[in-house]
Each structure stands twice: as structure tokens, then as C-alpha cells.
Design a protein with these regions (language model features):
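Single conserved hydrophobic/aromatic residue that forms the stacking wall/gate
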Residues: 1-15, 194-204
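ATP-binding glycine-rich phosphate-binding loop
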Residues: 22-34, 44-45, 57
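Conserved structural core of kinase catalytic domains
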Residues: 41-45, 50-100
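Catalytic-loop of the protein kinase fold
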Residues: 115-134
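C-lobe/activation-segment region of protein kinase-like
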Residues: 134-193
Length: 204
């Protein structure tokens, strides 16, 4: 048996690769006790202010990350043990109002946390495959090599919510469409999207 001749780490380690947003390469590693998401960009790795801040602080709502250079590229390794991606969550069950409300509340808290640590909110990935959840707590991926505008990324995320919302729950549909509608306005403010009354308090 070929597997029996390998070490336990090799037997249980599995790697899956795919192309991510913005041309990033994604790789996933798992063993008996841990799981990691690895993002690779074409930029030369730099141990800059962002990486020092990420590695020296447990920033609320962000996945823990370690960075390294490899073949003139940058690799960012995220600890995802015990968590599932938002994409996987949506494949199991449609998004309900409480799920969307909880997500938005935590997302806005993360935006403020990122700003408080003088990091760039545009480096947050809002790809459903890069956002993780465990016990209803969401963890976001901050990637220094990621390009793009956070407003455009959020607009794409709202399109995902519109597709994956539970259409049997009227208030969930209302919230998903309201977020999507707001994200199409010019120069909108994400952090102000949740200052309006809850759909529970409105006639739907």
C-alpha cells in the first residue's frame, strides 16, 4: 500500500489549487489538525508595515496570516482550521435575514478595525471563498498584495447575497436587494448602510 509507506502528515495532507480573484493563485492545505488557505500574488514579497501590523496584532475579525517570499512572488498563509467559507455556507443553506444582519454588523466592525490599525480597506478580499465563519463569527482575509476597490468588491458581494438569499423569507430578500441597490449609488458609504431602520420595522 503506497499510503502506508508515507508519513502520517503526507497521508492526510491534501492540496487544492485554483485561480482566485485578480489573478491570485489559491492553494489549500490540510492535515490531521490544521487547515490553511494560501494566496499567492506576482508581487515581490515585502515585510512592510502592513505585514508587521498583521503578524504582531490579533486584529478582530481578520484571519491570522503569515507571509513569505517564494520565487519572486508573495505567499500569504491563513489559518482556517475549524472554519468554513461563506461560499460553502451558502451552498449548504440559503442566507436568512438574521444571517445577513449578523454579517453586515461584523463586516462594518472589521472595516473600522482595519482603519484603526492604519491598514488599507481595499486589501480586504470580499470573495465568498475567502471569508470564513465559525460559530456565527466571521473572519475576513486581508491580503497586502490584493488590488481593487472595496466599494466594487462589496457590490459584487451583494450580488452574491441576492442570488443566495432565502426567497421564502421576505425580509431577507428585502435586505439583500436594499444592500445591492445602495451599492450601485455613486460614492456610497458602506459604514452608513446599516444606520437606517431594520426591515423588521418597515412594511415589506
Amino acid at each position: 500500500d503506497t499510503d502506508r509507506s508515507r508519513g502520517l502528515g503526507d497521508v492526510y495532507k491534501r492540496q487544492d489549487c485554483r485561480k482566485g480573484p485578480g489573478g491570485m493563485r489559491e492553494e489549500y492545505e490540510r492535515d490531521l489538525h490544521h487547515a490553511w488557505m494560501i494566496l499567492e500574488t506576482d508581487e515581490l514579497y515585502k515585510e512592510d508595515y502592513q505585514m508587521r501590523m498583521l503578524m504582531e496584532n490579533a486584529i478582530p475579525g481578520l484571519l491570522s496570516v503569515r507571509g513569505q517570499g517564494k520565487d519572486d512572488k508573495s505567499q500569504y498563509r491563513y489559518e482556517i482550521s475549524g472554519k468554513i467559507s461563506v461560499k460553502a455556507k451558502g451552498e449548504k443553506e440559503h442566507w436568512k435575514f438574521a444571517d445577513l444582519e449578523n454579517f453586515m454588523r461584523q463586516f462594518i466592525q472589521v472595516l473600522y478595525a482595519v482603519k484603526n490599525y492604519l491598514l488599507n480597506v481595499n486589501c480586504l478580499s470580499l470573495d465568498p471563498g475567502h471569508i470564513y465563519v465559525s460559530d456565527e463569527i466571521y473572519y475576513f482575509c486581508y491580503c497586502p498584495g490584493l488590488e481593487g476597490n472595496i466599494l466594487e468588491k462589496f457590490h459584487e458581494l451583494t450580488e452574491y447575497f441576492v442570488r443566495e438569499t432565502d426567497y421564502e423569507q421576505k425580509e431577507a430578500v428585502y435586505l439583500a436587494y436594499e444592500l445591492h441597490k445602495a451599492s450601485m449609488e455613486e460614492n456610497y458609504n458602506i459604514c452608513l448602510l446599516y444606520t437606517s431602520p431594520s426591515p423588521r420595522d418597515r412594511s415589506v
